[in-house]
């Protein structure tokens, strides 16, 4: 009985160690990948097509990594990176594309094996991230859908130990970008992201309140807000 219990405990310990090693390797390799193929908010899809195995090996590593929501920073960082990597993989698999919308089911039908499950991009965003962390609107500034209308992708992986800083940094960057928040006196044009996910941004006030929380030059309280059309043009290198 004692030997069986000991064997079981050793087995569990081994699984924990292996999972931790795989997780560390995943974040390190993801960081190298983004640093290699992302520059100034653009993705070099042509180069990735030529070296596709790097991406496939990275995502193969992600297949068996399973994380729980109670470890929020690990969980969020893993799924943010995985979303962005799977978007890139989907573009590469359908190369050349002018827009992710050129491929039917890009976000809501195509399933990917990652984190021990088969899941669509929409489900990563809506079920694994937004539903599990309903008070975290900053996801919208780090999940990159391959369209130029998204806040730009960064040349680093999101890491558990730096995630809070990175979320804050990317939100500040987006909301202080005059091309993202377009101000003309008291008329303000904002991304359709704020229209589609309005509830995420207005739990503690109006859209203007949320934007002003991060914007250095505050919007007038009486701002007339409208939405400009989302740009689905592919975010590839020029």
Question: What are these language model-derived features?
Answer:
Residues 22-238:
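Interaction/scaffold regions that mediate signaling and macromolecular assembly across diverse proteins
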């Amino acid at each position: 009985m004692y030997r069986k219990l000991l064997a079981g405990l050793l087995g569990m310990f081994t699984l924990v160690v292996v999972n931790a090693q795989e997780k560390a390797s995943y974040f390190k390799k993801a960081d190298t990948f983004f640093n290699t193929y992302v520059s100034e908010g653009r993705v070099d899809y042509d180069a990735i097509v030529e070296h596709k195995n790097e991406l496939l090996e990275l995502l193969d590593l992600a297949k068996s990594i399973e994380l729980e929501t109670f470890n929020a920073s690990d969980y969020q960082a893993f799924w943010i990176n995985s979303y962005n990597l799977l978007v890139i993989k989907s573009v590469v698999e359908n190369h050349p594309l002018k827009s992710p919308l050129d491929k039917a089911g890009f976000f809501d039908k195509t399933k990917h094996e990652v984190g021990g499950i088969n899941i669509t991009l929409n489900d990563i965003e809506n079920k694994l991230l937004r539903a599990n962390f309903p008070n975290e609107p900053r996801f919208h500034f780090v999940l990159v859908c391959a369209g130029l209308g998204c806040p730009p992708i960064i040349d680093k992986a999101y890491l558990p130990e730096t995630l809070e800083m990175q979320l804050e940094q990317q939100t500040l960057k987006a909301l202080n970008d005059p091309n993202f928040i377009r101000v003309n006196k008291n008329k303000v044009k904002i991304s359709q992201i704020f229209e589609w996910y309005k509830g995420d941004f207005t739990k503690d006030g109006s859209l203007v309140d949320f934007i002003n929380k991060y914007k250095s030059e505050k919007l007038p309280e009486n701002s007339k807000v409208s939405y400009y059309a989302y740009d689905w043009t592919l975010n590839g290198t020029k």
